[in-house]
Amino acid sequence: MKRKAIILGTGPTGLVTAWKLLERGWKVNLIEKNSISGGLCRSWKEKGFILDTGPHIFHTPDKDLKKFWKKNFNDILVEGKFFCKNIKGKNFDEFYDYPFSKEALNLFEPKLKEKIKKELKFYKNPEQRRKAKNYKEYVNALIGPTLREMFFEKYPKKIWGIDTDKMTPDWAPNRIKFRNKILPFYHEEYAAVGKYGTGCVYDRIKQKIINLGGKFKFNETVIGLSSKDNNITHIITNKKKYLINNDETVISTLPVSITAKLLGKQNNLKFRGVCSVYIFCQRHSILPKNIHWVYFDSKNVLFNRITENKKLSKFVAPKNKTLLTAEITYSLGDKFSKQKPKNIIDQVLKDLEKVKLVENYNVIGTSINYEPYVYPVQFMEQKNETFYIKSFIENFNNLFSI
């Protein structure tokens, strides 16, 4: 008798899990609340453009993973060398290369450059990092206070919504490379994007699943899980109640906080969401030459990152037109999440003019998308709850949360 899996969610994790289980002889059903698969990596067409939930790059230094990607998706991946910059300054006219390099540091004003070099020598102390009690202390011990204040203070707060001294040290980057030269963001790694948006890769996986006998149930939201003696007995959706037999395994790819709540375990685990505003422009290109995305840590503009998707793949926008994605992080229930979509779009357009990227007369259309569960937030005082909730879920014999 074939073993059977019921997978909740059809994002990358759910799709790849289904694909590989089917290849091993399992029967697989997938339940998805949206009308299409792909989760946070889905793509869709709108007004002649291909939109992503957010720009995604397939990158890895692992040769086996590169081989796997090229074997299965080579014809729908566009390899590239991708560059980005931090845009700062009162007039948004200061451009800083990222990741850091000695070449870029040498372009700094002499006094600032010397100060940073001294701090890099003084603070290069593993013992200080081990003693760090929060993100701020850890980054200080890694690169010194000057670079931290320039690049790792305002931006993390804008992304996560909390001060860096309230964030745990493990949020901090484990290491910050100082390269000799200004090089692509993903140096010495395979890097590519989906030719027709990230979703085209996951659409292919979906087709592989169908060809192997997997079944999809779209537009169906899981609203509860019933259990008895540490086994899941039923999956309840907005359409149906599914009985789980002894030979069936439930695999949840939903956020761990949601999986716990479906089992009746309330919790305070939080996520940061991403609102993406799409700007369709009657221009060939917008960002500076060879720049694919830019970061903004300023409180005076709504967005934290702007990506020109057509620079990643020319196939996502019509000829002589381009597409910008403005990303804004938020939390469910905060002031931003209560704004009307039109007001958000209008503010993004004003801010794009402010940073001198887009004039309104170039804009031929806009759209907006919300993803409320993107980045798991871990306040220092909630770290124990994360372990507690994961342990609670692991107690169920026929349930896996991945």
Functional labels for PLM-detected ranges:
Residues 3-30:
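N-terminal Rossmann-like FAD-binding beta1-loop-alpha1 element of flavoenzymes
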Residues 13, 36, 257:
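Conserved Rossmann-like nucleotide-cofactor binding loop
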Residues 22-45:
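Glycine-rich FAD pyrophosphate-binding loop
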Residues 24, 223-342, 347-361, 390-391:
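Mid-domain catalytic core of redox enzymes
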Residues 47-127:
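Dinucleotide-binding Rossmann-like beta1-alpha1 core, especially the glycine-rich loop
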Residues 64-92, 146-150, 268-272, 286-288, ...:
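A short alpha-helix-loop-beta-strand transition element characteristic
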Residues 104, 112, 116-227:
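Active-site/ligand-binding neighborhood in enzyme catalytic cores
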Residues 314-319, 371-401:
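FAD-binding beta-loop-beta segment adjacent to the flavin cofactor pocket
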